[in-house]
Amino acid sequence: MANQPSAEELKKKLSEMQFYVTQDRGTEPPFTGRLLHNKRDGVYHCLVCDTPLFHSHTKYDSGCGWPSFYQPVSEEAIRYIDDFSHGMQRVEIRCGNCDAHLGHVFPDGPQPTGERYCVNSASLAFSDEKNGDQLKG
């Protein structure tokens, strides 16, 4: 993993919610994320280290309250960890570069993968394909 900024540096760089989600494995409230309804073409990056994670063409409305994707940009982009917290068995997803918490992946997504990457907006930054504008979750 890449060198990650210290917790003190990240607290200065990130909002309270962004720090909670990416560093403390938190979850933003459903239907509140800034990137949930984003429909522009572009790439979703890790908010902490700017690693590309998902293309907009793999985003879909799952109705779960968080941005959902059916496939990451590459296998290396995401790190998978078994998560047995809160009395559930899930698979946590983290940035493959800096280890920031992103959300979870579930086996109930659309084809072609059948997977739903349920991602906190607060862990993402979006780069617009047409004009290069950046939007942070």
Curated annotation (Swiss-Prot):
Zn(2+) binds at C46, C49, C95, C98. Its EC number is 1.8.4.12. One of its GO terms (molecular function) is peptide-methionine (R)-S-oxide reductase activity. Residues 7-129 form the MsrB domain. Keywords: Metal-binding, Oxidoreductase, Zinc. It comes from the Bacteria. Its cofactor is Zn(2+). Belongs to the MsrB Met sulfoxide reductase family. This is Peptide methionine sulfoxide reductase MsrB.
